């Protein structure tokens, strides 16, 4: 697993949130804290025990359940955290753990006592898989993404006695509600995530090793980095290339379309300074949306430069006779100068002497259209005689 460093380099690092969850669950198991985190509805009447609605996901009382939860975190949780970012992954995990716990307590209050009374992280795994698997995306391979949580729901009771089946089902239902947008009003805004990531703590964790906070896709930390012409790497990588891992293991889509393959601008007249942005390369770990957005932007710029319509010839300039003094214009006309050229010369100098100097020197052309009023060239007199 690779994470992007503070200057864009890649270094081997593990996703922070899912790795810390593994350490925390293992530590709680070793110290025997699992029974103290059981989701017991009768204990929730005590205000100091309400934390069980959330912390029940961290405790385990059976070793097979702990091993299954730990196995799914590196195989599924790491990919989810890379796709969502550390902050959004933590928010989604906590939200789904709370939702599944509330649903289990509700079912227990309705008489289904087996829906609660246990603990474990498997309901959160099922909720995260269900929430991601039901998003609109083309399935890849023989196993559709939406089928994975249902298969896991059927296999988990065969591998471990905790949590009970109804509690697992509550996690799956919470994930389906999450995918349907039931918790959208609880989602943090992009601005809020950006403010958090720019804080001192998040910036410090983003540069740590071997555990690293991953930036949320769409934030400034995910934008491509350009270098000035003098300090760019000598051999920049091809632009717009998304990570093969994200294509194959998480996006569950077909091979990238031809439009996402590396394209180099080839139009004429482009200088090195004008193409500094073209040297930005996407490193492994870049999400698909970033490569797609950058590719669409580059192709739009290239198409506008290559296939843009030819500029229409500029229309001839026009000048109104009312913009100059009629008395001075009459003086020039009595001297024998054409009216159109006299108007232009007077407009340029404002004085008869200066206008005569321009006209005698032949410095006034015949391209300007002169109008009688303040309108456009529709009332033009046309150029005067040579």
From Swiss-Prot:
Localization, UniProt: Membrane
What is the organism of origin for this protein?
Homo sapiens (Human)
**Tree of life domain:** Eukaryota
User: Could you identify this protein by its name?
Assistant: Rhomboid domain-containing protein 3
Q: Which InterPro entries match?
A: Peptidase_S54_rhomboid_dom, Rhomboid-like_sf, UBA, UBA-like_sf
Transmembrane spans: 20-40, 58-78, 92-112, 141-161, 163-183
Enumerate the UniProt keywords alphabetically.
Answer: Membrane, Transmembrane, Transmembrane helix
Write down a Pfam family by its short name.
Rhomboid
Residues of the UBA domain? 324-362
- UniProt topology in membrane: Multi-pass membrane protein
One GO BP annotation of this record: negative regulation of natural killer cell activation
